[in-house]
Amino acid sequence: MEEKKCPVTGHTQHTPTGGGTKNKDWWPNQLNLNILHQNSALGNPMDPDFNYAEEFKKLDLAAVKKDLYALMTDSQDWWPADYGHYGPLFIRMAWHSAGTYRLNDGRGGAGDGTQRFAPLNSWPDNVNLDKARRLLWPIKQKYGKKISWADLMVLAGNCALESMGFKTFGFAGGREDVWEPQEDIYWGSEGEWLGDQRYSGDRDLENPLAAVQMGLIYVNPEGPNGQPSVLASGRDVRDTFKRMAMNDEETVALVAGGHTFGKCHGAGPASHVGPEPEAAPLEEQGLGWKSTFRSGKGGDTIGSGIEGAWKPNPTTWDMGYLETLFKYDWDLVKSPAGAWQWVPTDPAAADTVQDAHDPAKRHAPMMTTADLSLRMDPIFGPIAKRFRDNPEEFADAFARAWFKLTHRDMGPRSRYLGPEVPEEELIWQDPVPPVDHELIDEQDIADLKAKLLASGLSVSQLVSTAWASASTFRGSDKRGGANGARIRLAPQKDWEINQPAQLAEVLAALEGIQTEFNSSQSGTKKVSLADLIVLGGAAAIEQAARNAGHTLVLPFTPGRTDATQEQTEIYSFAVMEPKADGFRNYLKGKSSAPAEEMLVDRAQLLTLTAPEMTVLLGGLRVLNANYGQSKHGVFTQRPETLTNDFFVNLLDMGTEWKAVSEEKALYEGRDRATGELKWTGTRVDLVFGSNSQLRALAEVYACSDSQDKFLQDFVSAWNKVMNADRFDLA
């Protein structure tokens, strides 16, 4: 075939725009700022004024559920339902949509429908879930923009459970779809499916990962690295579910409850299975794993490689899973696909389970290595026995654990939508008290600002405390933020980064102002400490602007309340302790990732853009908000004055920078002519002069005419962080 040539120039046509060698190929360690600009409006097909929450409120949820119930038993020839019921398939789909969540960074989960996109749509653990989503398409098509894919997948899981006799805890809508893969999520560094280079030492799993192998949701059901060691599997199960925010009881309830339904698929060798959806040919239209084993579907389906059902009635909620688990002794065998699994030693069990497609066939139940850990593990075992002997307790535990699994990344209850939102407040929702008092008005705000500035607290102290309170927010799972004032509670009050001794002094002063104001009111008007902390930051920034000769009035909206210690789950907040915060020039110990990468990661969690990250860091440096009041990056002779000095001095070619150690974590900036020490800075500071994109942004704020823009942009970005968790303002 002749090469195509341009009809104008006669030159050979090359790869279309976007192909070829990329910057990342030349410089693989280049700082990735793209994660700060995901899900641009340019890639969103919805109208600019589209409001998903308002559309969902118009949805007839009962009608959608009726259609889902009907779908459960409407078996399609192109993908027949096991036992004539799609319920188990939809449970797995919903579970695997939600099960990517990990507590450490709040990323993953069911909140944005990313199971539709790579890599999740092609993970080995998600084999054949492409069919589940395709079965849902007619319902999604029918209700359109009123229900997102993210909500529909979770709702389908709930309806599947309900259609098989289980009473769920509730359902909340409000998950808005994204339109592209989430590139900010670190799934591991392995270059092949099921790789496990994520471990070191005595099976220490790399943070923030939760799954044991690349492409798995939780654990390898055959056992660690495919080796059928039951007790070792129990260790993996415990660690993985803990990293996904589940305790031991929730873990047992979820596994036992989920495996009450359906079966595994390993009818033949995996060599018959074709490529995953992202690698499948065009004519497959987004489907993958096409099998050449006999019919390739129904009783010939190949999925995980394990074959069989866990209990006699796979489409009915009952105690069959736990009863079967403890009733038999188990022999290790291999499935027709060659996967390790366990079958009862008792020959009488051989015909206790019906076939999924042929009523004339019967089978023995099976268990995976991970299943047996629920019996043999010294902690899981007693819990599983108690659940077996107390069906109502088990049902309640599974209902609550399933609700937590599928709603964990949605944030506070104020984001929940729909008529099936449970009334009970759960501690993992990070509850805050409702506003039960009159809010402060504009005059009160002005008076309180004056008292804050007259309190003896410095600009630096007020700014640092407000930032420490608000910057815990994570856009990933909508946790953290200034609302609740949890900075005064365990564990946040004791975090190293918050400088506990100084923090205690600041909080004592703020609480004094709060008490004085509240006790002087004749009505119900009050100011919360959460509001006062943010207001203190605003007052300090306004003062810093006045120090620079400018007048600013920062926007402030009261309405935050103060959480109690009883409303704060210490364990789940403890994992949110920053190991690094470049905005405060803080780095705890050594890290495998460069400090500048961790800055970008934190900025992404705060939902900041690259310009917002840039202007915020530059402003915080001159406000002297560093951890420990270090002078690293404080490129100004007038600290606590809101100027663009950080950018001006960083880009000054009169300064020569050199690393002061082999680790290249700290640098000195000396006068090129005299050698005199001018500044010290960290990697986080110097990257704004080194990285070409960040330097371009820094140049904007270093220009002679940029002071007003710098002030406006800093205030805008600051206000964004202060209100990041104010879902009531959206």
Swiss-Prot record:
Gene3D superfamilies from the UniProt entry: 1.10.520.10, Peroxidase, domain 2
Entry comment on modification after translation: Formation of the three residue Trp-Tyr-Met cross-link is important for the catalase, but not the peroxidase activity of the enzyme.
Superkingdom of the organism of origin: Bacteria
Any one of the GO CC terms: cytosol
Residue positions of the active site: H96 (proton acceptor)
UniProt feature coiled coil, ranges: none
Note accompanying the cofactor annotation: Binds 1 heme b (iron(II)-protoporphyrin IX) group per dimer.
Residues that bind heme b: H259
Residues at the site labelled Transition state stabilizer: R92
UniProt cofactor(s): heme b
Example GO biological process: cellular response to hydrogen peroxide
Region (Disordered): 1-25
Classification via InterPro entries: Catalase_peroxidase (IPR000763), Haem_peroxidase (IPR002016), Haem_peroxidase_sf (IPR010255), Peroxidases_AS (IPR019794), Peroxidases_heam-ligand_BS (IPR019793)
Protein EC: 1.11.1.21
Residue location of crosslink Tryptophyl-tyrosyl-methioninium (Trp-Tyr) (with M-244): W95-Y218
GO molecular function: catalase activity; heme binding; metal ion binding
UniProt crosslink position (Tryptophyl-tyrosyl-methioninium (Tyr-Met) (with W-95)): Y218-M244
Subunit structure: Homodimer or homotetramer.
UniProt record similarity statement: Belongs to the peroxidase family. Peroxidase/catalase subfamily.
PANTHER family: CATALASE-PEROXIDASE (PTHR30555:SF0), HYDROPEROXIDASE I, BIFUNCTIONAL CATALASE-PEROXIDASE (PTHR30555)
Stored NCBIfam families: cat_per_HPI (TIGR00198), PRK15061.1 (NF011635)
Function: Bifunctional enzyme with both catalase and broad-spectrum peroxidase activity.
Protein name: Catalase-peroxidase
Lineage start: Bacteria, Bacillati, Bacillota, Clostridia, Eubacteriales
Gene: katG
